Amino acid sequence: MRDEHESQMKGEGGAPADRYAIRYYQRLWAEGGLMGKPEHVNGHGFVMACPGRSSDVIHIYVWIADACIQDIRWQCHMCDPWMQVAGDILCHVARGTPSAGVLQWTWEDFEHRLGGRSTLIVEHAGAAMLTLHKAVIDHQVRLCLADQQGGGAHLDPGLKLRELGFAGRAGQQRLRRRLEETFAAFDLRIPHVKMQEWVALGTVQDVSLTVQSLVERQVIQRILGQGCGFPRSFEEQLAAQA
């Protein structure tokens, strides 16, 4: 019965699953993994990683303190099994590491925990890395927008920017300077109209999602360079948006 079940586990396009992916998936549900949500969260990222398989998304939640990922969990209720495996592996790999190093992981880091090479997990590892990077960006935005006395780790994503003191033209200039300095590594350039929208009505979450979107293609190229890929339907959707 087990062999029959394993033979039915496939990836996108009907690609057969391999023993490493199947064993990890079975162990994940038998023993439990890093699913769920940490008790404390100060960064959250999500990606529709498998648009060809599901309308659901993978979420990664982090608790970052002292520039280190202290706790990390994933949720992906309807994603295919291989996205769940990739997400769980990355959470184990990243827990306890510096948050600044989230784009330094390579396929070898996944393979070491998986026990062998799996084409299916290679195709999902990049989506997991992208989701984690978005969670770290979300945390960085919260810190960036916090007041000088701190509190960024607990900043409510729904808080209006005007409640944080960003108002008028001076608020726009101060906001732009903070964000572009924080994300200088990506040569971030924020459209003027966005600055106006944010200061008028925007929230912390609005800023975070826009920054994530502006740097996404750069991040994807870096991830691909690390030997990690994306589900076929994700790549097709990305190409259609180009």
Locate predicted features.
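Domain-level signature for proteins that mediate thiol-based redox and metal-cofactor handling
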Residues: 2-242
